[in-house]
């Protein structure tokens, strides 16, 4: 299956790229610059494409991202600290982001003769991000089949949609994903902050997967307090 992978440069999508390269025919990685404050993630996506020997397509969505206002990822709004499932994390939603990116991905796949678009949405995303849930991915694939009817047959591949981030860590480790060469932190500093929702989720995933975490965090211990606080609610 000739598969295009939507790759942010994060742990999930880079793991998916490595898994896809071994299980299917990885054709290309597609990334998006939508004006995110953690734009450095794109360097990790580019490095993954180089490592895996496939073309890297960087789509400039900055003008679109500028119109999708109100998110801590694109506006001058502080990224909150805490557990990834807390309501405060809703400020990190970029409206319709995945739908827009997937639509472009399907267009690229159709133009290039690919058979599938793979995205690393997973169970941990369901709390906050509606365009990561199974209902959305099923509906989106139906829409795309109608949009490309008679022109191209491209499927949506979402192997992690019902899995946890810990499951992704285990699968990534089994396929030799270099986790140190991935970026998750939404704050986009020199190193992972260890306090934002994505850092907490990343640290917890390695712990639950019982896989060594090579990540350097500015606050390496905060995650456990965030998890404990959530469980106490």
Curated annotation (Swiss-Prot):
GO terms for biological process: queuosine biosynthetic process. InterPro entries: QueC, Rossmann-like_a/b/a_fold. Its EC number is 6.3.4.20. Binds 1 zinc ion per subunit. One of its GO terms (molecular function) is ligase activity, forming carbon-nitrogen bonds. Transmembrane segments: none annotated. Catalyzes the ATP-dependent conversion of 7-carboxy-7-deazaguanine (CDG) to 7-cyano-7-deazaguanine (preQ(0)). PANTHER family: 7-CYANO-7-DEAZAGUANINE SYNTHASE. This is 7-cyano-7-deazaguanine synthase. The gene is queC.
């Amino acid at each position: 299956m000739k598969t295009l992978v939507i790759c942010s440069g994060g742990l999930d999508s880079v793991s998916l790229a490595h898994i896809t390269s071994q299980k299917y025919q990885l054709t290309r990685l597609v990334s998006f610059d939508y004006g995110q404050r953690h734009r450095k993630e794109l360097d990790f996506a580019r490095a993954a494409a180089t490592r895996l020997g496939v073309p890297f397509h960087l789509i400039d969505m900055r003008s679109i991202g500028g119109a999708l206002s109100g998110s801590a990822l694109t506006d001058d709004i502080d990224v909150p600290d805490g557990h990834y499932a807390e309501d405060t994390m809703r400020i990190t939603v970029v409206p319709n982001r995945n739908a827009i990116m997937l639509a472009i991905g399907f267009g690229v796949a159709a133009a290039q003769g690919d058979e599938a678009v793979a995205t690393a949405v997973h169970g941990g995303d369901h709390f906050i991000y509606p365009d990561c849930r199974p209902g959305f991915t099923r509906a989106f694939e139906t829409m795309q089949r109608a949009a490309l009817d008679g022109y191209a047959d491209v499927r949506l591949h979402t192997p992690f949609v019902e899995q946890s981030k810990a499951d992704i860590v285990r699968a990534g480790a089994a396929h030799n994903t270099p986790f140190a060469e991935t970026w998750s932190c939404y704050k986009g500093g020199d190193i992972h902050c260890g306090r934002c929702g994505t850092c907490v989720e990343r640290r917890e995933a390695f712990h639950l997967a019982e896989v060594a975490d090579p990540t350097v965090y500015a606050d390496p211990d905060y995650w456990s307090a965030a998890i404990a606080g959530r469980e106490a609610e």
